[in-house]
Amino acid sequence: MAAVLKPVLLGLRDAPVHGSPTGPGAWTASKLGGIPDALPTVAAPRPVCQRCGQPLALVVQVYCPLEGSPFHRLLHVFACACPGCSTGGARSWKVFRSQCLQVPEREAQDAQKQGNSLAAEDWCEGADDWGSDTEEGPSPQFTLDFGNDASSAKDVDWTARLQDLRLQDAVLGAAHPVPPGLPLFLPYYICVADEDDYRDFVNLDHAHSLLRDYQQREGIAMDQLLSQSLPNDGDEKYEKTIIKSGDQTFYKFMKRIAACQEQILRYSWSGEPLFLTCPTSEVTELPACSQCGGQRIFEFQLMPALVSMLKSANLGLSVEFGTILVYTCEKSCWPPNHQTPMEEFCIIQEDPDELLFK
């Protein structure tokens, strides 16, 4: 039986973030750039580059709670924007996960007793239910959520919950002022779309144009590259060619994103990442969660279109990458009364040709 494909949600750049939002309106929003927002009772991450020692700039903030879970959940991805660290690899990138209770302690305990079978919340406010994967398994299932969708919030009065947290969040924010000189990218909200909504509008002209340029540089025949990536007579076998595996991986990447080239983020909890280059042993040798020892799973990745959107608010900063693969604790563990963000893991795949995405 064929494996059930996990749904994929796409993150797109939306409106600029104006001013300095605070409270739940800030930390329940997904965004690129700006200042990292902190959940109530959890300190905002302030990482530094392991290569140069300078503060890291926030690349994206993703609000991704679980329906049925007692926790708010926030992920931050940081990078070093210093020119000398553009090729610093994992030492110049950091990922952090923060969680805090969104219901009183007694209700949280009752929710935990109901088991780990958690459905996914929608990723954006007012979004339609794009279909949760109903495949049975012991692990919770995640998607992203921008707000309080009635279909997923069910009978919980989220407005009251968030209002109760405003004062506490304001106090925490006052206790952790933004350090002067913190590198910042201009902030924009991230909106969401279902990748399936783009399937009927695929235009491969742009992908083919880029691949023709690639072919001329590498001396590779286009028909070979295409045949290596297309099914043969409807089955799962591919034609055998002399194409390098890296070229096949690259073409599959370009073909998949052709329908929505402006995507800056792909989210598919426990799904399959879209590799830009051939995966290395890092993918099969992921480090275990440092807190619970459990395994990590793929959650989302940052896409090449994001690079040109990371415009600096100061100091002329920039980052370069092909795609960033983010892996998080499968159990999304969070000890009682924990108050500091937990570090997760990311894999950096460099752009095989930076000019292709500009």
Swiss-Prot record:
Q: Which GO terms describe its biological process?
A: apoptotic process
Q: List the record's Gene Ontology CC terms alphabetically.
A: cytoplasm; membrane
Q: Pfam families recorded for this chain?
A: PDCD2_C
According to the UniProt record, list the residues that bear Phosphothreonine: 22
Domain of life, per UniProt, equals: Eukaryota
**Which keywords does this Swiss-Prot/TrEMBL entry list?**
Acetylation, Cell cycle, Phosphoprotein
- Positions carrying N-acetylalanine are 2
Tissue and organ expression note: Higher expression in lung, colon, mammary gland, cervix, stomach and small intestine.
Task: List every position bearing Phosphoserine.
Answer: 20
InterPro entries noted in UniProt: PDCD2-like_regulator, PDCD2_C
**What does the record list as coiled-coil region(s)?**
none
The protein's role, per its UniProt record: Over-expression suppresses AP1, CREB, NFAT, and NF-kB transcriptional activation, and delays cell cycle progression at S phase.
Q: What is this protein called?
A: Programmed cell death protein 2-like
The species this protein belongs to is Homo sapiens
Q: Which gene encodes it?
A: PDCD2L
